[in-house]
């Protein structure tokens, strides 16, 4: 069983989410991860965002995974995530700032090991999740999400992963479509 905790402070040079130029934010974050075994992992995170216009947002997130089935080449994990957040005030601003928001999602992750030879391995991963999200003033809507990735563990301790993700989130009552492509290369670890 492993417990990890972290306290972080960040002052990104970039913009606040969806904010016009000139809006910046500072982030304070407390993070706790509990890994009772290789088959279960839970994370709890509390964040506070302080925007340059004086607004403040508090957020609490819980996420976890639990192994449901395994054989030598396929792993199936159940996924769960929940979050709740609130803004200090409900004034009109130029970025996403609901007075109250919450979300719950559940899903499944299927990982197939294509091949493995000593420290080299190729895996592919599919994640499917869905759940309701709530925003004060706009009610609840269901949000689906789908992601597919390739993960390469290279014998020298480095790792390469890439994939595509799709979701249909709702902001201020308007449904959006998000499509993401990502590429990640790391030294000294597995993806």
Walk through the language-model features, giving the residues of each.
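Gram-negative and organellar
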Residues: 1-191
């Amino acid at each position: 069983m492993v417990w990890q905790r972290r306290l972080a402070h960040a002052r990104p040079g970039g913009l606040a989410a969806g904010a016009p130029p000139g809006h910046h934010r500072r982030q304070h974050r407390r993070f706790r991860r509990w890994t009772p075994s290789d088959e279960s992992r839970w994370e709890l995170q509390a964040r506070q965002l302080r925007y340059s216009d004086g607004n403040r947002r508090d957020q609490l997130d819980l996420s976890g995974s639990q192994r449901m089935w395994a054989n030598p080449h396929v792993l199936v994990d159940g996924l769960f995530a929940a979050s709740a957040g609130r803004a200090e005030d409900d004034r009109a601003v130029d970025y996403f700032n609901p007075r109250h928001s919450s979300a719950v999602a559940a899903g499944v992750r299927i990982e197939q090991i294509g091949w493995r030879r000593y420290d080299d391995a190729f895996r592919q991963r599919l994640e499917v999740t869905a759940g309701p999200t709530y925003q004060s003033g706009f009610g609840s809507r269901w949000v689906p999400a789908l992601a597919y990735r390739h993960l390469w563990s290279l014998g020298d301790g480095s790792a390469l992963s890439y994939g595509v993700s799709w979701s249909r989130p709702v902001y201020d009552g308007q449904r959006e479509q998000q499509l993401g492509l990502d590429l990640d290369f790391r030294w000294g670890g597995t993806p």
